[in-house]
């Protein structure tokens, strides 16, 4: 699957995120894609409208369920190549890391491929 950014021009992505944010003020527009070279399944959809008060850990749980990942398999999500804190609210992560087009881009992987904030 090609990436959301490569499929849609910037102007279209920006217009869509602005429409979403004005229509759903307490939601965060998130694009969730599997990291390259990851061995876990592709998620069935990549666009999410996430409640602002959802934690990163709760979002990981949503993704885990959508890809039907067994409990013994690990999953990590990355925002700008860093591992966000599990207890962080998605709204706070969005405010800090949203793209110029207005979406928050999240990658997921079965391995800790990028390291964590403590290692950088």
UniProtKB/Swiss-Prot annotation:
Keywords, sorted A to Z: Autophagy, Cytoplasmic vesicle, Lipoprotein, Membrane, Protein transport, Transport, Ubl conjugation pathway, Vacuole
Record keyword Protein transport present: yes
Compartments reported by the entry: Cytoplasmic vesicle, Autophagosome membrane; Vacuole membrane
Lipid sites, type Phosphatidylethanolamine amidated glycine: 115
Proregion residues excised on maturation: 116-120
Site residues, Cleavage: 115-116
GO molecular function (one): phosphatidylethanolamine binding
Membrane topology: Lipid-anchor
Cellular component terms (Gene Ontology): autophagosome membrane; cytoplasmic vesicle; fungal-type vacuole membrane
PTM (free text): The C-terminal 5 residues are removed by ATG4 to expose Gly-115 at the C-terminus. The C-terminal Gly is then amidated with phosphatidylethanolamine by an activating system similar to that for ubiquitin.
Major subcellular site: membrane
Gene Ontology BP terms: autophagosome assembly; autophagosome maturation; cellular response to nitrogen starvation; mitophagy; protein transport
Pfam family of the protein (one): ATG8
SUPFAM superfamilies: Ubiquitin-like
PANTHER family: MICROTUBULE-ASSOCIATED PROTEINS 1A/1B LIGHT CHAIN 3-RELATED
UniProt similarity note: Belongs to the ATG8 family.
Known function: Ubiquitin-like modifier involved in autophagosome formation. With ATG4, mediates the delivery of the autophagosomes to the vacuole via the microtubule cytoskeleton. Required for selective autophagic degradation of the nucleus (nucleophagy) as well as for mitophagy which contributes to regulate mitochondrial quantity and quality by eliminating the mitochondria to a basal level to fulfill cellular energy requirements and preventing excess ROS production. Participates also in membrane fusion events that take place in the early secretory pathway.
Protein name, UniProt field: Autophagy-related protein 8
Organism: Eremothecium gossypii (strain ATCC 10895 / CBS 109.51 / FGSC 9923 / NRRL Y-1056)
